[in-house]
Amino acid sequence: GNRQSASLYDMIPAVPQNSKPFGEWNKAKIMVYKGTVVHGQNDENVLEYHLWTKQWTDMLQASKFSEDKWPLAFELLNNCGGENHEGFIGLQDHGDDVWFRNIRVKILD
């Protein structure tokens, strides 16, 4: 479903769902370039979407982040990056043990 590893939470499931079992490292990659976002997991691209499009807004409206259900989240996500299309990188978990290693950021021209 759309709440598993590498998915776009509550919007797009990662296909294939190729996460490794507990105790093994997963390799993740998120590429954002001119509004196109690609999620990769364990050396396979698992989903793609496009920010700042009607499709993006429609996906938000069909999710838990809709304007009716969560107005602040909708506003932030629908306008992510602001006028300059810049933002932040965040690492998140929901109370379970989690480890990160070898984090790299590359600016695409």
Predicted regions and their residues:
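Carbohydrate-interacting regions of secretory-pathway proteins
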Residues: G1-D109
